């Protein structure tokens, strides 16, 4: 179900990056050896290091290159990376090597390999799990934390499944009926036919305030392994678009968030049908010390739909 997200996000990248010379994701990156694997990074700008942690799980860094201009007239250095099993980084011989814990430890491994002192993290969607997990375990190494359109627990991720399926059943009954027929025959989320049927639902329907922002474009240079479906279903469970399991079916940060000491910014979109608002606002209870901002004309990607406001918010947050 989520594979389409990273296909569409190639459009986001090509449509939002400004006409300025920045490092090239294909030619200007650097590898670091971390926990027995080579991880690919691209660094933009100078200043306080801010790691951008992609969503998925399974997505590469390229869709987020539209954030490059955060480095203009600011003291921010963006560090993009392809996590283990994604993009240009090494992949596992056994899918069981993929885990949330591994992703968290790889952030710490990258920090050390890059000889950085304190870092900041911006985790989007699934990336927020990695960011929150890192903040809880390695808070002493963290300067700022941004939870962007994120999830605080497996309960919230299950609501993602439930709400998405409800919306599809209600608004795309022909897709839902086809899906139910193959499920009755034994198909599950990780099966290719199941993923293909889910892909008939336009991305913007579930993820956008203005779906037109996510239509067309593309045609750019292919990027290797932009989304690893095998990794995705290893981490969300084999039928993870209906019932979350594996790592995603067990994470829960709700009781620990209130103890975090670093500055925290939590971003949500009013029209997000994935990281749903009624679950997002619970962050105010679980992490009362954070600054919480609801973007009223955005879905799952306020950095695209309310770009100017989003960029201003991040730049201001990173100053303090």
Task: Indicate residue ranges for each PLM-predicted region.
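Conserved HGGG/HGGXW glycine-rich cap/lid loop of the alpha/beta-hydrolase fold
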Residues: 31-91
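Conserved acidic catalytic loop of the alpha/beta-hydrolase fold
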Residues: 101-119
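Conserved hydrolase catalytic core segment
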Residues: 117-161
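Flexible "cap/lid" loop of the alpha/beta hydrolase fold
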Residues: 146-188
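Conserved alpha/beta-hydrolase catalytic His-Asp/Glu region
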Residues: 183-239, 256
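Short beta-strand/loop motif that positions the catalytic acidic residue
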Residues: 260, 266-268
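Acidic catalytic loop of the alpha/beta-hydrolase fold
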Residues: 271-275
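Catalytic active-site module of serine/aspartate enzymes centered on a nucleophile-bearing elbow/loop
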Residues: 290-320
């Amino acid at each position: 179900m989520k594979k389409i997200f990273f296909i569409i996000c190639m459009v986001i990248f090509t449509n939002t990056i400004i006409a300025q010379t920045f490092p090239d994701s294909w030619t200007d990156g650097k590898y670091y050896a971390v926990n027995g694997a080579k991880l690919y990074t691209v660094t933009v700008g100078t200043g306080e290091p801010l790691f951008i942690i992609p969503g998925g799980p399974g997505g590469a860094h390229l869709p987020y290159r539209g954030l490059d201009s955060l480095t203009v007239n600011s003291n921010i250095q963006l560090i993009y990376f392809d996590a283990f099993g994604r993009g240009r980084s090494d992949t596992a011989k056994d899918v069981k090597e993929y885990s949330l814990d591994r992703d968290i430890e790889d952030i710490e491994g990258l920090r050390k390999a890059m000889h950085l002192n304190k870092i900041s993290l911006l985790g989007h969607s699934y990336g927020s799990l990695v960011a929150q997990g890192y903040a809880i375990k390695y808070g002493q190494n963290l300067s700022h934390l941004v939870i962007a359109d994120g999830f605080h627990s497996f309960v919230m991720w299950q609501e993602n499944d439930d709400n998405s399926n409800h919306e599809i059943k209600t608004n795309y009954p022909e897709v839902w009926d086809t899906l139910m027929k193959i499920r009755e025959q034994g198909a599950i989320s990780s099966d290719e036919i199941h993923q293909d049927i889910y892909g008939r639902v336009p991305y913007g329907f579930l993820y956008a305030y203005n779906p037109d922002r996510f239509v067309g474009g593309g045609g750019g240079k292919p990027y290797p392994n932009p989304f690893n479906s095998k990794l995705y279903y290893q981490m969300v469970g084999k039928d993870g678009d209906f019932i979350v399991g594996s790592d995603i079916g067990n994470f829960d940060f709700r009781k620990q968030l209130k103890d975090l000491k670093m500055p925290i910014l939590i971003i949500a979109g009013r029209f997000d049908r994935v990281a749903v608002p009624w679950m997002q606002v619970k962050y105010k209870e679980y992490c009362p010390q954070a600054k919480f901002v609801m973007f009223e004309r955005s879905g799952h990607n306020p950095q695209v739909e309310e770009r100017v406001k989003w960029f201003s918010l991040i730049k201001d947050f990173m100053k303090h």
